[in-house]
């Protein structure tokens, strides 16, 4: 009796919503594929991150100073306002660490 009851409930669910069964089967298949190939997938994704980081480092090193072409009176005015564009020492290290942490969170 219980077996017939469970089979009738399963049959009712399949007739009512067959896409649920299809989604469950596809989820099981994809989950088993990911589980069996997880290490390869992890290596593939981490390899892409390292390549992207190298490309970003090259791009950062190629960036030019935006105030390089500014005239001397503009630079003097920026200096009087305290907006000099040179960053050195501890400030430079702090900004580099900040940039690395922001770029790694993407």
From Swiss-Prot:
It is a single-pass membrane protein. Its main location: membrane. Keywords: Membrane, Transmembrane, Transmembrane helix. The chain crosses the membrane at residues 5-25. GO terms for cellular component: membrane. It is found in: Membrane. It comes from the Viruses. The keyword Membrane applies. Belongs to the nanovirus U4 protein family. This is Protein U4. It comes from Faba bean necrotic yellows virus (isolate Syrian SV292-88) (FBNYV).
């Amino acid at each position: 009796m219980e077996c017939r009851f469970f089979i009738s409930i399963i049959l009712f669910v399949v007739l009512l919503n067959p896409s649920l069964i299809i989604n469950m089967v596809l989820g099981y298949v994809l989950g088993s594929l990911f589980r069996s190939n997880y290490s390869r997938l992890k290596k593939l994704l981490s390899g892409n991150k390292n390549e992207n980081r190298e490309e970003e480092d090259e791009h950062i090193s190629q960036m030019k100073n935006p105030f390089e072409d500014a005239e001397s009176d503009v630079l003097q005015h920026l200096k009087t306002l305290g907006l000099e564009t040179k960053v050195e020492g501890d400030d430079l290290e702090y900004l580099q660490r900040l940039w690395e942490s922001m770029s790694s969170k993407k």
